[in-house]
Amino acid sequence: MIPGLPAADSAAVLALLKQQQGLEQVVLYGSRAMGRHHSGSDVDLCLLAPSLHLEDLLLLGARLDDLLLPWRFDLQLKHRIDHPGLIEHIERVGVALL
């Protein structure tokens, strides 16, 4: 489950993510992974999906938007992250969701 989201909303997000072809793992990071989130915190997700392209990421983001949930989802493809500090943060505090 995603911390701070109602169980039904969290389940809807995870079910949608499970449908994505080529998705090997989903890691929650940021304030929700560290337990420091508040009601307006976004949901930071790092996707381990080497075969996905930016177009796929945009479509996945649009599908998440179609759920009409009140949170913003920040999606990152791990193989496209070029900021060493962000990768270190994800590896240090990340929580595998899928």
What are these regions (language model features)?
Residues 44-47:
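Short beta-strand->loop micro-motif that forms the acidic, two-metal-ion catalytic signature
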Residues 31:
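Conserved H-loop
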Residues 1-25, 34-39, 50-98:
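Catalytic core of pol beta-like nucleotidyltransferases
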